[in-house]
Amino acid sequence: MTIESLAPTDALPWHLRDNWAPVLDERTDTELRVDGVIPPELVGTYVRTGPNPASGTSGHWFFGDGMLHGVRLANGRAEWYRNRFIQTPNISDPLDDPMAGMGDLTRGTGNTHVMAHNKQLLCLEEGHWPWRVDTELNTLGVQDYGGELTCSMTAHPKVCPVTGELIAFSYLSPEPPFLHYIRISPDGQLVQLEGIELPNMVMMHDFNVTQNHIVFMDLPVCFDLGALETGLPFKFDRDAGARLGVMPRNGANADVRWFEIDPCYVFHPVNAHESGNSIVLHVSRQKEAFGSSNDDYAEVGRLWKWTIDLDAGTVTEEQVDDRPGDFGRVDDRLVGLDARYGYLMAMAGEGNSEEPVYGSAFWKYDLASGACVEHRLGDGVRGAEPVFAPASTDAGEDEGWIISIVHDTNSDQSRLVIIDAQD
């Protein structure tokens, strides 16, 4: 389904045409066709979110209303598919200018990431509070942790597999200290909201967590009102420098140690872990971001390894591979621990400033050796973020499946793929 428009398709911005075009109808389909075999032990609901303007138009990719797509798997069957708008005030009372709602924390879209914590499904983006939905994709309301959360929350919190804590942060603040650290208990209570001093506001899309530390990425996509005319008030400024901030997980601003690195940008790290008195990070690093405008995605990330030596006060920066990839994940049971395998989506379209181009493969990296195994999706098939589902609660690492919704540009159809992670 695509938006109908009187304008020629090629006259629309890239995020409103082809597979990016808004889906305006909500639907529920049952007893879905299955090609191949769904493992009978794979039981649960796959849910993804993405920007999907309910009005049919938006000024920037990032501003579209959140739409959820879910597929329920059980007993070797795909029982249902459904898509639902996240019912935020932006649906019932839309604003002409999305930036006008930045001060109202209820006006989130939930269009960037979905995750579970404390038996709740959270839909997130980085400028507002999360929104809660149930397993049928019905909207339940905002999550402000009993009124204790007084700032926005990142789209990419981490759930510690050891303690069950939700670790998060917030960067969208017009006033110092420009960054806040957020820690939520396993039962959903806000236990820490800590101001972290930065020299200015930067677009900190994601961060890193280990068993004992937080690693913030102060990278030079800086607040710049002059850039607002291209969609967002942020601009890459190499002269601002780049650094990593290491803090104990229960620490405060005074405990942060900063380590300078070469200027770059990272939308998504893959994982981080401790090794002796060092912290090892694997990230999808790109040379810069938003080159000609805030709608320029010509730069793509590649897998890099950063090793922070806490004794020497240094960072070693190493490129692991030259293949472009992003949206990296590990087994959620190993977030912040020494995971061996990372799963990334290939990126295409390097140098194409007109639109982002998702690749036609998934990469599985051995993070210890840097070796990479490719899974081809097929010519003209575009991937999405790969999610690992273990075969059982006690299955070993890499014993399970990679799940994602991919799009076939040849047939203009999307499908859920389930791939044996070891095949």
Regions found by a protein language model. Name each.
Residues 1-423:
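Beta-propeller domains
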